[in-house]
From Swiss-Prot:
Belongs to the universal ribosomal protein uL16 family. Part of the 50S ribosomal subunit. It comes from Ureaplasma parvum serovar 3 (strain ATCC 700970). GO terms for molecular function: rRNA binding; structural constituent of ribosome; tRNA binding. NCBIfam families: rplP_bact (TIGR01164). GO terms for cellular component: cytosolic large ribosomal subunit. The lineage of its organism: Bacteria, Bacillati, Mycoplasmatota, Mycoplasmoidales, Mycoplasmoidaceae. Coiled coil: none annotated. This is Large ribosomal subunit protein uL16.
Amino acid sequence: MLQPKRTKFRKPHKVSYEGKAKGNKQVDFGEFGLMALEGAWIDARQIESARIAISKRLLKTGKMWIRIFPHMSLTKKPLEVRMGSGKGSPEKWVAVVKAGTVMFEIANVSEELMCEALRAAGNKLPIKVKIVKKGEAN
């Protein structure tokens, strides 16, 4: 699964996913992309399951780009622990995805196969998504 090799700080502040994306809003590398319509923290496991769903349908013919990476660690305190006494230990790595972010891109495959693969990947993610074409205005 995806996670940073090293970070400057182990326990970052929580970053908000509200609002619209400032960058990463259009399809740059492939022909079609999967765009988030709402913001969320996307877990490394969810990114991996979406990647597997796409690669199963591409059948070694197409090319895929993952445009998001889980840079931020989410912490959690153990069960039945009283409040206070510091922040919990890092539990998982998440990518902060805002509305309008292109998360996956695909190229070199027929349009039907691309749409099927991106739809399958969208079903693995906890947010509403749409399939966008290269050059489409957002």
